C-alpha cells in the first residue's frame, strides 16, 4: 500500500520538473531560430541591421542610391528650367510669418550633376501647399558661395525664390585665412541673422542644401510648435544619422526606451492566454518575464531601431521628442527668437576640426544655465548629400 500511496506525489513531482525543463529547451530553440534563422533572413539586406551583409550588398546599394539621386537631380533641373519662365510663386514674402525656412547652399563642384539644392527646393515647393489656403512657410535661399564661378543652381532659383547673399564688400574679406569649419559656422550665422533681419519670423527652420524634407515635414513641425516644450527650447534637431540611432548608446532615454519595449512585449506575450498554444510552457513568472524582456530587446537592437522608428510616421502625434544629441545640423528648428541666441553663441566660439558648429552648439547648450535642446525621431529630412562640401570625398561614396 505504501508504494501505491506515493504514486500521485511522485507523478506530480515529475510533472512539475518536466514543465520547468520544457521551458528551457523551448527558450533555447526559440532563441536559435530567431537569432540564427529568422532575423538573419529578414535583416541581411537592411542597411542599419547588425545582420546586414556589408561585403555583399553595400557597393550595389550605394551605387543604386547615387543613381536615384542623380536622376532626381536631373528631373529637378528640368523642372526649375521650365518654372523659370513662369510667374514667381514663392518670391513675394510676408513679414513676420509663422514659419521661415532658410536653405543654406554653396557650390559643390564634385556633385554638380546631382543638383542637391534643386532637389530640396522642388520637394519644398510640392509640400508648401499642404497646410490649406496659406502656404506652410516662407522660404529663403541663402547662397554663401564665395568663388568666382558662383552657384548656378541658386541663380536658377532666383526666378521663383528670394535668394540672399553677402554684399560685395563682405565677399572681399580674406576668407582663405579661416579653416573650413570656421567658414561653415560663419556662413550659418550669416544665414540665421539675415533671415531674421529680413522677415522677423515667429519660428525658423534652417536646412542645409542636401536635407530633403519628408512629405509630412510641415505637419510635424506644426505639431512640435504646438507643444509646450517648444517654448523653452533653444533648438530642435530634425535629423540624426540613421547609423547612430541604435539602442546601444550612452543616451539614457534610449536605454529606458529599450528596456520599456522589451518589458511591454514580454508582458503582453505572457499575459494574454489566447496567444499561448498548449505546448507553450512559459508563464508570467519573474524568470520567464526576464527571458522574454531580454529576448525582445536583443531582437529589436539586432534588427535595427531605425526600422522600428519608421512606424511612428503614421501620425505627427507619434513622433518622439527627446533630449538633443550632438551630431549633426542638416535640419534645425529654432522656435521663437532662439535663432538670434544661437547666432550669438556661435559667434563667441571658434570652430576647428573636431569642434565643428554642431559640437560647439551642443556643448554650449549643456553648459549654459537655462538652455535646453531636443531631437525629434524619426528624421524629418533625408540626407542626400553623398558628396560633402567641407570634407574630402571618395570617387564613389558609400552609404556606410
Task: Report the location of each language-model feature.
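C-terminal catalytic/acceptor-binding lobe
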Residues: 2-63, 258-262, 267-400
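Short, acidic, metal-binding catalytic loop of nucleotide-sugar glycosyltransferases
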Residues: 82, 90-95, 119-136
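Hydrophobic targeting segments
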Residues: 97-105, 124, 135-141
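A conserved hydrophobic helix/loop-capping motif in glycosyltransferases and polysaccharide synthases
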Residues: 100-116
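Active-site-proximal specificity loops/subdomain of glycosyltransferases
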Residues: 142-202
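Short beta-strand-to-loop acidic/aromatic patch adjacent to the donor-nucleotide binding site
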Residues: 200-212
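Conserved donor-nucleotide/metal-binding helix-loop-beta segment in metal-dependent transferases, i.e.
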Residues: 215-244
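Juxtamembrane/start-of-transmembrane alpha-helix segments at the extracytoplasmic/lumenal side
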Residues: 247-259
